Amino acid sequence: MVANRLPVDRVEGGWKASPGGLVAALAPVLRARAGCWVGWSGAVDEPVAPFRFDGIDLYPVTLDAQDYEEFYEGFSNSTLWPLYHDLIVAPQYNEQWWQRYRDVNVRFARATAEVAAQGATVWVQDYQLQLVPGLLREMRPDLTIGFFLHIPFPSPDLFRQLPWREELIGGLNGCDLVGFQREADERNFRALVGDDNNSPRSGTFPISIDPAAVQVGSPEAVAKLRESVGNPGALMLGVDRMDYTKGILQRLLAFEQLLEEGVDATLIQLATPSRERIEHYRETRRQVEEAVGRINGRFGSVGRPVIHYMHRGVSKQELGTFYAAADVMLVTPFKDGMNLVAKEYVACHPDGDGALVLSEFAGAAVELHDAYLCNPFEGASILRAMREALDSDPERMRRMYARVLGHDVHRWAAEFLQEVAR
């Protein structure tokens, strides 16, 4: 496995498993297949020797401060991320960032070439490493190489804006198989590369979760949480990275309209800090926190805000309690490759209680047909879905639960690996 990050974070005295959808999805796959993981440790200017963690051999790639600024914050997240999410904010095109992106991709490819066994299968993950397959193909032609893009792939017209589009497509042309979350993403890719013998095979492989790893909150913990927020008539929940693609502000404004209608509801909004040195992310946080304060000022009372906002990460156990306690889960991104939060929430409601409000532009909407779909660009659409979710039919949640249970992360990985080996 080759990914931008190793599946661990540095803590005092050692390492702990990282939060996040990619890590949650891939770690069980590697353990089951005795694989290894090549990636950055998360520590800047700190060379780390290979080590074993939780049954997985990890091979760290060192990044310095300039790598982090230009490769990660720059080209990956200020150029590719906004471009691939339909220009919600304008991408920045910087030649120095591009050179750094290429240099870091070369480093990842070399590290992988050194540790991969003869004839091994290498699975490269996501937009930060799109050059690795082509570089690795030159270094190790014996390898079988797959690539999976976890975020959307843009339309040809948008992609052609990128000054280095030919180099990125050349990197993906080194693959035996390129995987996408949605058929629409694969169609966009095929429109660029064509269907001749020189282009890689491609397919659609919607990622999922490991339902067995989701920690459902106990009835006692759920009751305690609901009591702590005033036992509202309806408890709604948002769980997101603090990212401009997630539509958090528009969700808050729709919730404000719901309160104006006199609905007895409380919202818990968890917003994990993300990419805080990038201006668009800082501005998103400012707007969200301003809205939280204003809405609480209008509708809250002493000791009982209507929005409980936390700008921090939470443990799996805490998150499971939030999921289990929520009557309505709000997942309203402007654009999202999949969104595993939606599936984690469903996995916490096997008995049919709860309801899911889901953006039609999230990849999860392709599978979770029984969610209350909304257009996150239209406040009235979010509000309408919220209203409908307050009177949900339990059968809708049961059907979604069966879908998540039947198509878990192990099946996702097995299908991709079976196809790449074909």
Model-based region annotation:
Residues 1-422:
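Catalytic cores of carbohydrate-active enzymes across secretory and cytosolic contexts
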